[in-house]
């Protein structure tokens, strides 16, 4: 966009997302909300296609004196995952200048969006959809914590937890993501979670987990998401050791289709790994969004703290260069390599050595791999995101055109017309044979956050929830 201008630019210290040390970065804040950091001050204002997807729109700003004085944090909810970036500058005045500039850009973008919503010819359609959704939650009693049995902790992190639940009324299984409200709303600030939950409601794709309900309690936001029962892809691969190239092509195509959809909505998934891929009862891929930033794990040898699964991290993430959509194509390369080769492309128990491999080591292939498969994986696992297959402006189209996928009809992929190469042996959506036996037989308890909640974690009156009016959603009205 030619009318995008730089609002503020300067050096700041940015804390690494995975290796928690501080690095100097030259940041540009632009009128479109982009906030991009470079290792060196860029000479050319018209920089090449920016890979960064981080925007200050709909974000929450916090100031803190820890772990260093004059620190500020930008936090936002992307899909249902909390993304957080931490910066520090030398003086309180500098911090004030940055936070005021960021807030001004965010406020202006918010106003523009509201104006667009009011003037847009589609706003009436949007409103009808919202009314339908409200109606669905009115006619079907609003969901509360009491409507579910809690079976197993699927994940736990800094901002909340994900629990496998069974809806009492239907017997269906879901993953419930529970986020603490205080991490999303600043004390004096209304969060933008509602807008984000609206994005979630509209995120519908055959290979992405869909949102079934969302509701709130006194101090938590709850997202109830689809949980398919064909088993984790990791489980099936570990049983068979490797998948054929045909089977890998089928799964790879479905993943590309889903990532294409997310990228078109300006969402970078960031967390593609085997553990986040499941199969539905028919054998199609479902990419889960149960991710939470894991508690930091400290590597004793270096005393640096890591966040996440280091084996899957792209080079640009490790180096803490700003990254964007190409990070997902690296993730695709890693999972497809695992499927066809039966191991990770880079692995070492020592994190420092692992990082060196990811950044420097050339990829090696088994002799059994076809030249098309080698070519695809080599392209996806290029260290430089700008040169990576899928890293250019064409994004997924580069991958779709690759010879490994020749003969694939991408519309048929989306329409689920391709026959899955493996069908899980489940008889229905509530068949639990691929679940761990230890947790299908028993339920777990959730500690009530407040003693005065009627049912432990029930919904509260709207008047007592000024920040989150109407944070309630049921997909049943749309199916």
From Swiss-Prot:
One example GO MF annotation: protein serine/threonine kinase activity
Modified positions (Phosphoserine) in chain numbering: 472
EC number assigned by the record: 2.7.11.1
Bilayer topology: Peripheral membrane protein
Domain PH: 5-107
Gene3D superfamilies: Phosphorylase Kinase, domain 1, Pleckstrin-homology domain (PH domain)/Phosphotyrosine-binding domain (PTB), Transferase(Phosphotransferase) domain 1
Binding positions (ATP): 154-162, 177
One Pfam family recorded for the sequence: PH
Subcellular localization: Nucleus; Cytoplasm; Membrane
Residues modified to N-acetylserine: 2
Matching InterPro entries: AGC-kinase_C, Akt3, Kinase-like_dom_sf, PH-like_dom_sf, PH_domain, PH_PKB, Pkinase_C, Prot_kinase_dom
Top EC category: transferase
Processing and modification events after translation: Phosphorylation on Thr-305 and Ser-472 is required for full activity. Phosphorylation of the activation loop at Thr-305 by PDPK1/PDK1 is a prerequisite for full activation. Phosphorylation at Ser-472 by mTORC2 in response to growth factors plays a key role in AKT1 activation by facilitating subsequent phosphorylation of the activation loop by PDPK1/PDK1. Ubiquitinated. When fully phosphorylated and translocated into the nucleus, undergoes 'Lys-48'-polyubiquitination catalyzed by TTC3, leading to its degradation by the proteasome.
GO CC terms in record: cytosol; membrane; nucleoplasm
Domain spans labelled AGC-kinase C-terminal: 406-479
Cystine bridges: 59-76, 293-307
GO process terms (BP): brain morphogenesis; cellular response to insulin stimulus; homeostasis of number of cells within a tissue; intracellular signal transduction; mitochondrial genome maintenance; negative regulation of cellular senescence; negative regulation of PERK-mediated unfolded protein response; positive regulation of angiogenesis
Comment text on domains: Binding of the PH domain to the phosphatidylinositol 3-kinase alpha (PI(3)K) results in its targeting to the plasma membrane.
Family statement drawn from the similarity comment of this UniProt entry: Belongs to the protein kinase superfamily. AGC Ser/Thr protein kinase family. RAC subfamily.
Function: AKT3 is one of 3 closely related serine/threonine-protein kinases (AKT1, AKT2 and AKT3) called the AKT kinase, and which regulate many processes including metabolism, proliferation, cell survival, growth and angiogenesis. This is mediated through serine and/or threonine phosphorylation of a range of downstream substrates. Over 100 substrate candidates have been reported so far, but for most of them, no isoform specificity has been reported. AKT3 is the least studied AKT isoform. It plays an important role in brain development and is crucial for the viability of malignant glioma cells.
Protein name as annotated: RAC-gamma serine/threonine-protein kinase
């Amino acid at each position: 966009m030619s009318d995008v201008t730089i609002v503020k630019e300067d050096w700041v210290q940015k804390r690494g997302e995975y290796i928690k040390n501080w690095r100097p970065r030259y940041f540009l804040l632009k009128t479109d909300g982009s906030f991009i950091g470079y290792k060196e001050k860029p000479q050319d204002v018209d920089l090449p296609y920016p890979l960064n997807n981080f925007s200050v729109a709909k974000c929450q700003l916090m100031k803190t004196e820890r772990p260093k004085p004059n620190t500020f944090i930008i936090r936002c909810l992307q899909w249902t995952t909390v993304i957080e970036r931490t910066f520090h500058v030398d003086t309180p005045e500098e911090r004030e200048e940055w936070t005021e500039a960021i807030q001004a850009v965010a406020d202006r973008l918010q106003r523009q969006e509201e104006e667009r919503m009011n003037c847009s010819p589609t706003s009436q359609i949007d409103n009808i959809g919202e009314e339908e959704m409200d109606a669905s939650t009115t006619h079907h009693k609003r969901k509360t914590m009491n409507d579910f049995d809690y079976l197993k902790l699927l994940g736990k992190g800094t901002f909340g937890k994900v629990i496998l639940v069974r809806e009492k009324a239907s017997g269906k299984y879901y993953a419930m993501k529970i986020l603490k409200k205080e991490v999303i709303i600043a004390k004096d600030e209304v969060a933008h979670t509602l807008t984000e939950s609206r994005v979630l409601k509209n995120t519908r794709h055959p290979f992405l987990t869909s949102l079934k309900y969302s509701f709130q309690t006194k101090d938590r936001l709850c997202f109830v998401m689809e949980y398919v029962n064909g088993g984790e892809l990791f489980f099936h691969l570990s049983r068979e050791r490797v998948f054929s190239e045909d089977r890998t092509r089928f799964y790879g195509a479905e993943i590309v289709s889903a990532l294409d959809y997310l990228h078109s909505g300006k969402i970078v998934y960031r967390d593609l790994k085997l553990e986040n891929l499941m199969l539905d009862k028919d054998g199609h891929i479902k990419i889960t969004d149960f991710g939470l930033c894991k508690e930091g794990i400290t590597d004793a040898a270096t005393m640096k703290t890591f966040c996440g699964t280091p084996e899957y991290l792209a080079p640009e993430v490790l180096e803490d260069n700003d990254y964007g959509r190409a990070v997902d194509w690296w993730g695709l390369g890693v999972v497809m390599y695992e499927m066809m080769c039966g191991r990770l492309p880079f692995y070492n128990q020592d994190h420092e050595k692992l990082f060196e491999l990811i950044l420097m080591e050339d990829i090696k292939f088994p002799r059994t791999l076809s030249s098309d498969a080698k070519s695809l994986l080599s392209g996806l696992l290029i260290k430089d995101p700008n040169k990576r297959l899928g890293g250019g402006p064409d994004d997924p189209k580069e991958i779709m055109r690759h010879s490994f996928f020749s003969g694939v009809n991408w519309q048929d992929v989306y329409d689920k017309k391709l026959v899955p190469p493996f069908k899980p042996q489940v008889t229905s959506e509530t068949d639990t044979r691929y679940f761990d036996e230890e947790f299908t037989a028993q339920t777990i308890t959730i500690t009530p956050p407040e003693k005065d909640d009627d049912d432990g974690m029930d919904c509260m009156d709207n008047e007592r929830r000024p920040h989150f009016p109407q944070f309630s959603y049921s997909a049943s009205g749309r199916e």
